[in-house]
Amino acid sequence: MAAFNLALYLSKSIPGVGVLGGVIGGSAALAKNLKAKQRGEITTEEAVIDTGKEALGAGLATTVSAYAAGVVGGGLVVSLGTAFAVAVAGKYAWDYGMEQMEAKLQEKKHQEQGGQTYGDNPDPFDPQELETP
């Protein structure tokens, strides 16, 4: 009986390539978060959440990157350039979306605790709100 080759199996489809990217991205994030946890910089919960977000983001970016490289085709340089550019854009968009979602959740939590929202505070740099002598 032949041994099962996971990498070969996953590389046969674009979603499989995305899973492989998620495994690699999640592994890198876990290694980073374990060091941060040992230094006392983050909690276990924060490490788990960040590792999950990074794994999903890397998997998504890898999937979109593999698809784009396949659509564009071309030679090695064009395919690699396309894959790299699309992966960077995909991961950037994922991270931006996560930051926005976390900010909304923090604002909602702040409101539930009876605090003001950031939108309630006047903008100190708004020229219309400055007093004129």
UniProtKB/Swiss-Prot annotation:
One of its GO terms (cellular component) is magnetosome membrane. The keyword Membrane applies. NCBIfam families: MamC. Probably helps control the size of magnetite crystals; in vitro synthesis of magnetite yields larger and more well-developed magnetite crystals in the presence of purified MamC. Binds Fe(3+). The lumenal domain probably binds magnetite crystals, affecting crystal size and shape. Purified MamC self-assembles into micelles in the presence of ferric chloride hexahydrate (FeCl(3).6H(2)O); both oxygen and iron are present in the proteinaceous micelles. Whether this is relevant in vivo is unknown. This is Magnetosome protein MamC. Keywords: Biomineralization, Iron, Magnetosome, Membrane, Metal-binding, Transmembrane, Transmembrane helix. It is found in: Magnetosome membrane. Residues 105-133 are annotated as: Disordered. Residues 1-5, 89-133 are cytoplasmic. It is a multi-pass membrane protein.
